[in-house]
Amino acid sequence: MNMTFTKVSKLSALIAISLGATACNETAAVSTQTVDKTIEAQKFIADAEAQMADLSIEINRSEWIYSNFITEDTAALSASISEKYTGTSVKLATQSAQYADLPLNNADKRKLNILRSSIVLPAPLDPAKNTELANISAELNGLYGKGKYCFEDGRCLTQPELSAIMAESKDPAELLEVWQGWREIAKPMRPLFEREVELANEGAQDLGYANLSELWRSQYDMKPDAFSNELDRLWGQVKPLYDSLHCYVRGELNEQYGESVAPASGPIPAHLLGNMWAQSWGNVYDQVAPQDADPGYNVTELLAKHNYDEVKMVKQAESFFTSLGFDALPDTFWERSLFVQPEDRDVVCHASAWDLDNLDDLRIKMCIQKTAEDFTVIHHELGHNFYQRAYKEQPFIFKNSANDGFHEAIGDTIALSITPNYLKQIGLLDEVPDASKDIGLLLKQALDKVAFLPFGLMIDQWRWKVFSGEITPEQYNQAWWDLREKYQGVKAPIARTENDFDPGAKYHVPGNVPYTRYFLAHILQFQFHKSLCEIAGDTGPVHRCSIYGNKEAGAKLNTMLEMGQSKPWPEALEAVTGTKEMDAKAVLDYFAPLQTWLDQQNKTANRQCGW
């Protein structure tokens, strides 16, 4: 027994040694291949990063020139460089896939994933189709930027000028004409957009995604469907507050305009909410606010009273950031930014923030109107600039926000500190209203911030379904209004058909700017604000807190900003809030006194809420 066992054992050992030697040789060969491939991947990442950094400066400059001087020549130059940039991006994204399963360090793995997933409009590998996509993209941008509506009296107005009428007029007929008139500029976009979707979907498939919807949703450090579920969860948290606000506003508009213009039930006609897209309702504040809720001041009027011109408005927004410990903006910012709509040429007036050299050449481009709304928008745009500068020491691929919602949230977080107390500190307001005026201030904020939430969500709900084929081109407009009614409870004021292309009247659709970031930003800003107020030691109601002048809060914020995109967004979120989960409860906490008041008003008026 023992002998047999020993012989078998020896034989087994010999076989094992023999097999082991073979396995060792194979393992060594595989190991050497892996090491070689890993070194190759690291070189690829470094080269890709250098290429993209150089190209980004080139495309930033060409797009800046095009946006500020819209001509056929600048459009051609922009399209040419955009084509080159997109082609390089797609090539690098495609090449990066071969390194996906290698044992790389976390930073390199992250860079590879970002290279592959961060192309918003991926061109097909076919060079002719790449050229076609670049030209379509430039043409869509131009149609929006040059868009004007001409009245019968010969006046031709741009989008900002038309938006000013939407904000100020209370004449339903005039509002309807402007609402309808601006949407005429979008009709020619429809076939271009349809073709753009075909080409970009092909580009997404070349990168290994099912379609552009899957690509867009893959940039959030979680699986695309898990991200969609996260959005549903956050919307579910805030929907009761939105429903209360919608019910109240609809009832007040009905009392003002009557049943034929503003029905007491069903969706609200979209031209009556003070905004070209009914995305924020702050301009109807005067129509819906109760008399005793008036805070006693109007920021637009205060800006005029204190002789704020466009530059002074920007200077004041900058001073908020410097009060937190951030360095002032460079001289070149003031020399190179566009603040006022030129009289001699077409420009893209939509507000945007620019980082031209990935270091210090920061700018904003907007046609500033001297209003409370634009005062807030300026804070928002500077938030982008201060974020851009904070992460300038990161490697190029990480020079971005933790997720795109973070970039949109930072300036708005600062703007939440534009409280009466802050306005008094900077000399705009003489006296701070007492707490009895809080309802008016909260209602104004809710009309801007809470009213926006379903709009911020639905634009990409529509686009994702378009990209995936769930919405076909024959259904573009009907599906748009179905979603607007489902989420926002608003409707088109006149019959629309598939000859119309109402999504194209919103800049971000022809401009190919993803929109879910704005929904996330409207959740995150309240979460950031609440946490920064706690860091600043403010123990009062969160809606009365201003972090202006608090260096400790500024330092905490800067820690997160400097991380850029180098870590998954939950880690960046934790740097300020102490938690890795987005939570809309901060929105409910901020507006808690208002929701109680809204529900009381709706109950007293016996309103039937919902639509």
Model-derived features: positions:
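Bacterial N-terminal signal peptides that target proteins for export
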Residues: 2-12
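C-terminal motif of bacterial Sec signal peptides marking the signal peptidase cleavage site
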Residues: 20-23
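C-terminal, non-catalytic "cap/extension" segments appended to globular domains
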Residues: 25-41, 72-74, 113-115, 211, ...
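N-terminal helix-rich structural modules
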Residues: 26-195, 213, 506, 513, ...
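Active-site-proximal, well-structured secondary-structure segments within enzyme catalytic domains
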Residues: 154-158, 195-365, 435-445, 451
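Post-HEXXH active-site segment of zinc metalloproteases
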Residues: 213-214, 218, 388-413, 427
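Post-HExxH zinc-binding segment in Zn-dependent metallohydrolases
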Residues: 231-241, 401-438
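Active-site recognition of the HExxH zinc-binding catalytic motif
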Residues: 373-389, 408-412, 462
